[in-house]
A protein has these predicted regions:
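Class I S-adenosyl-L-methionine-dependent methyltransferase catalytic core
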Residues: 1-134
Length: 134
């Protein structure tokens, strides 16, 4: 799962590590090899990086807010967290996908799904800790 950076494309040791065009291109090529990727992206269908070849796109109804970690102290008012200023979408790269190519999901439903998933992860983590302590 990822929320890719929208920064300009840059390389490290000859490999692109940022830039949506390259991130989406890499996800697509890894999908062809069996990789499964889910990205929270800007719903910007006119951008050159828009993932036309994604197996599923879910457009999000409602803006998504971003919460910073409790330890983060904004340097100035430019770093104060706000909601996204653009519409969002979820791009799925998974060649085993059997659902529709396009769908819509409300922000509240998406957040509820995320909370349910996190509850399952926490439950399994607690179980693992107990087993390791025994």
């Amino acid at each position: 799962f990822g929320n890719p950076p929208y920064s300009r494309a840059s390389q490290h040791e000859g490999q692109y590590i940022t830039g949506m065009r390259y991130i989406m291109k890499h996800a697509s090529s890894m999908r062809d090899k069996g990789g499964r990727y889910v990205f929270l992206i800007k719903a910007a269908t006119s951008e050159v990086w828009w993932p036309e070849d994604a197996d599923h796109i879910a457009f999000i109804r409602g803006r998504i807010g971003f919460e910073l970690p409790a330890w983060f102290i904004p340097k100035d008012e430019k770093q104060v967290p706000t909601g996204a200023f653009f519409a969002g979408a979820i791009a799925v790269f998974d060649k085993t996908w059997k659902g529709p190519a396009i769908s819509y999901i409300g922000r509240d439903e998406l957040e509820a799904c995320g909370e349910a998933f996190l509850a399952q992860v926490r439950q399994q983590a607690e179980k693992l800790v107990r087993e390791m302590a025994a």
